[in-house]
């Protein structure tokens, strides 16, 4: 089992935290365990409340069912069902930017 450094950033929220996330745990779950307050609703990859945008790195979000191919190509990620596949940086609180 690999573990990756996931950096969660959002200038407006004053967020810049790096956490270690195993490749078999969701980013949102580990962030919560570390005391980082991120938005969420369904926790099942079926809405956009937890949306973030990948700035660098790779993630696996094959469990999600909400984002379309264009949104995924643009780098959007649902943190509630995203596993890290490399060290990565994610801009959080991106639900409004999706639309």
UniProtKB/Swiss-Prot annotation:
Domain 2Fe-2S ferredoxin-type per the UniProt entry, residue ranges? 4-96
Q: Which InterPro entries match?
A: 2Fe-2S_ferredoxin-like_sf, 2Fe-2S_ferredoxin-type, 2Fe2S_fd_BS, Beta-grasp_dom_sf, Fd_pln
Question: Where [2Fe-2S] cluster is bound, by residue?
Answer: 42, 47, 50, 80
Q: Which CDD domains match?
A: fer2
Q: Is the rRNA processing keyword given for this protein?
A: no
Keywords from UniProt, A to Z, are: 2Fe-2S, Electron transport, Iron, Iron-sulfur, Metal-binding, Transport
Residue runs in coiled coils:
none
> Per its Swiss-Prot or TrEMBL entry, what cofactor is needed?
[2Fe-2S] cluster
**What's a GO biological-process term for it?**
electron transport chain
UniProt GO molecular function: 2 iron, 2 sulfur cluster binding; electron transfer activity; metal ion binding
Cystines in this chain: none
User: What Pfam families does the record tag this protein with?
Assistant: Fer2
UniProt xrefs under Gene3D superfamilies: 3.10.20.30
Q: How is the cofactor bound?
A: Binds 1 [2Fe-2S] cluster.
Under the heading PANTHER family, the entry gives: FERREDOXIN, FERREDOXIN-2, CHLOROPLASTIC
**Entry similarity comment:** Belongs to the 2Fe2S plant-type ferredoxin family.
Role this protein plays: Ferredoxins are iron-sulfur proteins that transfer electrons in a wide variety of metabolic reactions.
What name does this protein carry? Ferredoxin
Source species: Halothece sp. (strain PCC 7418)
Q: What is the lineage of its organism?
A: Bacteria, Bacillati, Cyanobacteriota, Cyanophyceae, Oscillatoriophycideae
